[in-house]
Swiss-Prot record:
Organism listed in the record: Frog virus 3 (isolate Goorha)
Biased composition (Low complexity): 65-77
Disordered: annotated segments: 56-77
Name recorded for this polypeptide: Uncharacterized protein 071R
Length: 77
């Protein structure tokens, strides 16, 4: 924070360091909120992608006949 105190010694309109610190704290708070929201969106998106990958990859690894038999038995349940 020392850099900001040096900056406000010349002071835009004589604002105190508390005003600067309050502004900085608000910006930091906003950034943390945005990052958290972004992380949640990424987590949701990656979960969706992984779910789709799981569904599409598993049948391709099996021969067509067994994949058809498995999907039929799933519908019967």
């Amino acid at each position: 924070m020392s850099g900001f105190r040096i900056l406000d010694s010349a002071g835009p309109q004589g604002q105190s360091s508390y005003t600067w610190e309050a502004k900085i704290a608000q910006v930091q708070h906003d950034m943390v909120a945005m990052i958290n929201t972004f992380n949640q969106q990424i987590a949701g998106l990656s979960g969706t992608i992984m779910g789709r990958l799981d569904q599409s990859v598993i049948p391709k690894q099996q021969p067509p006949s067994s994949a058809a038999a498995i999907s039929e038995s799933e519908f019967e349940d």
